[in-house]
Amino acid sequence: MSKLDAYFGEFGGQYVPQILVPALDQLEDAFIEAQQDPAFQKEFIDLLKDYAGRPTALTLCQNLTKGTKTKLYLKREDLLHGGAHKTNQVLGQALLAKRMGKKEIIAETGAGQHGVATALACALLGLKCRVYMGAKDIERQSPNVFRMKLMGATVIPVHSGSSTLKDACNEAMRDWSATYEEAHYLLGTAAGPHPFPTIVREFQRIIGEETKVQILEKEGRLPDAVIACVGGGSNAIGMFADFIDEKDVSLIGVEPAGKGLDTKMHGAPLKHGKLGIFFGMKAPLMQDEHGQVEESYSVSAGLDFPSVGPQHAHLNAIGRAEYGSVTDDEALDAFQLLARKEGIIPALESAHALAYALKMIEAEPEKEQLLVVNLSGRGDKDIFTVHDILDAKGVL
């Protein structure tokens, strides 16, 4: 059977204990077969449509761009069942796991969105589900923890390291290496060991495919730029995939600058990391002078990741995509602005992409441009975090 490319340029690969290689090989073969099976594809597309609610809307911002010559559209992944883009690829991987005869699903989660999406897919498809989550993230995302439990998932707190996403990833991988005969590791982003970055991209590419059709319908042309936030990078690669060959469309990824790139409190490895091996892949990584993984930081739990998917690293290296960053404060401003001006409360992750678009518009208000921001999720999970921050600032 032909195999998928394990690398994107120099990035990617499969840096895992030998015991996991057969499991990854089996997964790759099953994925290639499923991609060529019309019955599998139909089942996946039907679930996206009739269960998850695709296609999602492409919404023109009515008020945010007043007084400028920009048209700004939002790709509304916040309207997807489960509240974020995560549901797309989780349904794909869960179907794939079932096809492979697996009975259990292991997952990791940061903001809890991937955990919720995994829990709902497992409930729907009759699979047992256990989710590893950093103890710190469990504290800041309690509504999502309860959602997972409601849908029958077991949530396992991780107290090691920084008690956040990277530690949950390590524990999930450790579990899988002991249980892969009966369990599938449902990785939540377009990163990790091959073939995960490719599988996740292919199950997310519907975002960009729909956007292309919708924008041509509404505007008669492709956008000047598509903009998405980047933690591990799955919502961004889902938006970018169908536009990579459209050379006139700029691809812009937005990393979290946290408290500022001049501090240690950020999560921007693409621009401020060094090449390293982490989470089964070779990719830019936040490291200290001894090569140890540095803690990343972002106000948004879902972007709080010290590395980035290998295809993003490659797109950055060859100059096909550009990657900027946005601070906590800029993201919080965009979060409030979208709520006030358009009546849409975005996820803090998505607010980073919106903030970057607003900076582009502000820099050149007279420029005629057509922009699409991937609004990757809704902000229900973040209202308590934002409330506490604004309260502390005396803004409320």
Curated annotation (Swiss-Prot):
It comes from the Bacteria. The modification N6-(pyridoxal phosphate)lysine is found at K86. It is an enzyme of class 4 (lyase). This is Tryptophan synthase beta chain. One of its GO terms (cellular component) is cytoplasm. Keywords: Amino-acid biosynthesis, Aromatic amino acid biosynthesis, Lyase, Pyridoxal phosphate, Tryptophan biosynthesis. InterPro entries: Trp_synth_b_CS, Trp_synth_beta, Trp_synth_beta/beta-like, TrpB-like_PALP, TrpB-like_PALP_sf. It comes from Photobacterium profundum (strain SS9). GO terms for molecular function: tryptophan synthase activity. The gene is trpB. Belongs to the TrpB family. Gene3D superfamilies: 3.40.50.1100. Tetramer of two alpha and two beta chains. Its cofactor is pyridoxal 5'-phosphate. Its EC number is 4.2.1.20. PANTHER family: TRYPTOPHAN SYNTHASE, TRYPTOPHAN SYNTHASE-RELATED. The beta subunit is responsible for the synthesis of L-tryptophan from indole and L-serine. Pathway: Amino-acid biosynthesis; L-tryptophan biosynthesis; L-tryptophan from chorismate: step 5/5. PROSITE patterns: TRP_SYNTHASE_BETA. CDD domains: Trp-synth_B (cd06446). It catalyses: (1S,2R)-1-C-(indol-3-yl)glycerol 3-phosphate + L-serine = D-glyceraldehyde 3-phosphate + L-tryptophan + H2O.
